[in-house]
Amino acid sequence: MFWLLAIFAYLLGSLSFAILLSRLTGNPDPRMSGSGNAGATNMLRLAGKKLAVLTLLGDLCKGLAPVLIAHLAGLSLQQQAWVGLYAVLGHLFPLYFRFRGGKGVATAAGMLLGLYPPAALLAIAAWALTFYLTRTSSLAALIATPLTLPLLAWQEPEALLPMSVLTLLIVWRHRGNLRDLFAGRERHF
């Protein structure tokens, strides 16, 4: 059952709402325009609030749904977390879009919401506060994601290993943003 759900999660995660919505509405491919990221923040820059919100909700749901299904199937919390990670991997490396996807932040938030809602709320609050203070989405993601690890270690240690892997993946996907942050070139809203 685990591997079936992991494959389902990867295939679901491979649906890029940013790319699909941009194609449906005649907007530029987010991988080729703006920041080059197939995610909600770049959709906000390229296509406006409505499509950005739809992208955000779609990406959240594709992280949340596999975790909830894994829970209903009776998988352990750690297995649920690994299933959720496969959804994020689908977002990062989508099968349907030549393995060029987004950075996984919204999909990871959906995954975390399904695993342990208090950690998701902590991450969302940290992201919102950091974004409010800095107007920099990448910095907000880089602060919010690792902040969940101590809470998970304390409350849900079974999920710590998959969430640590997730954190490393998100930091790795933001490596260009980190270079730009340190060089003072990162984009702000």
Swiss-Prot record:
Q: Which pathway does this chain act in?
A: Lipid metabolism; phospholipid metabolism
InterPro entries, A to Z: G3P_acylTferase_PlsY (IPR003811)
Enzyme Commission code(s) on record? 2.3.1.275
Which regions form coiled coils?
A: none
**Any Pfam family hit:** G3P_acyltransf
An annotated GO BP: phospholipid biosynthetic process
For this UniProt entry, what's an example GO CC term?
plasma membrane
Q: Where are the transmembrane segments?
A: 1-21, 51-71, 77-97, 111-131, 151-171
Q: Which reaction does it catalyse?
A: an acyl phosphate + sn-glycerol 3-phosphate = a 1-acyl-sn-glycero-3-phosphate + phosphate
Q: Which domain of life is it from?
A: Bacteria
Please give the family membership noted in the entry. Belongs to the PlsY family.
Full protein name: Glycerol-3-phosphate acyltransferase
What is the species of this protein?
A: Pseudomonas fluorescens (strain ATCC BAA-477 / NRRL B-23932 / Pf-5)
